[in-house]
């Protein structure tokens, strides 16, 4: 079970940092770019930063998948203040009990991602394609935690590959991809999953 300790949400060991408190402003920035509306699906609750920001928008419903028992209980307590929120104790990418959605936000931590989740090179690409094919309405928007290790050339290559993968896997859809570098000077030195200069806020708009 995950454990909240100091400024970090840890997984099965201290090497698995699920989330940290410094992410609050980054999460809020991603959600503000997404501008949630209609029915929203969020993968992962963590500290609830993105969930709370989603609730600031005029949404119809807000479904959150959270598999960890401790974080799930925290999410249930949080949801008492937000009648549009529905918490499902379920691990991504299981899509049982899910409907169709207008907006998606993806930030799970998967300690042992299997070959299926990594078939496109990273879990974010799998998330996009899975949702577009099975869960998205005709017009939909997506954002996710995006840390690209390296310089701007690597960032360009990452999003070029993402676009090529989308066009190959979902050829009948139209896409608009926007990405902005995030001022990540507040990332602490003991964070082991990203660092200053690696964070981006993506927005993918889809019509199908």
Region roles according to the model:
Residues 1-37, 49-52:
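Class I SAM-dependent methyltransferase Rossmann-like catalytic core
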Residues 14-17, 150-208:
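Class I S-adenosyl-L-methionine
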Residues 42-46:
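Class I SAM-dependent methyltransferase core
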Residues 47-59:
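Conserved SAM-binding loop of SAM-dependent methyltransferases across substrates and taxa
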Residues 61-66, 144:
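Conserved SAM-binding motif I beta-strand of class I
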Residues 67-98, 111:
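S-adenosyl-L-methionine
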Residues 118-138:
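A short glycine-rich, Lys/Arg-flanked "PGG" loop and its adjoining helix->strand segment in the class I
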Residues 139-147:
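Conserved beta-strand signature within the Rossmann-like core of class I S-adenosyl-L-methionine
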């Amino acid at each position: 079970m995950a454990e909240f300790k100091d400024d970090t949400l840890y997984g099965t060991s201290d090497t698995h940092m699920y989330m940290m408190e410094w992410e609050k402003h980054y999460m809020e920035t991603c959600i503000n770019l997404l501008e949630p509306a209609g029915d929203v699906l969020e993968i992962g609750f963590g500290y609830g930063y993105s969930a709370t920001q989603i609730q600031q928008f005029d949404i119809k419903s807000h479904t959150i998948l959270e598999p960890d028992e401790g974080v799930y209980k925290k999410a249930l307590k949080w949801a008492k203040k937000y009648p549009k929120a529905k918490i499902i104790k379920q691990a991504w990418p299981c899509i049982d009990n899910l409907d169709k959605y207008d907006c998606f936000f993806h930030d799970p931590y998967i300690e042992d991602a299997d070959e299926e989740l990594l078939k496109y090179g990273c879990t974010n690409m799998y998330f996009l394609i899975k949702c577009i094919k099975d869960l998205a309405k005709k017009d939909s928007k997506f954002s996710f935690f995006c840390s690209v290790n390296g310089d701007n050339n690597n960032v360009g290559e990452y999003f070029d590959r993402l676009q090529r993968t989308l066009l190959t896997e979902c050829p009948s859809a139209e896409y608009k991809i926007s990405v902005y570098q995030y001022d990540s000077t507040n990332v602490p030195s003991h964070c082991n999953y990203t660092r200053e200069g690696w964070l981006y806020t993506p927005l993918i708009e889809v019509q199908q």
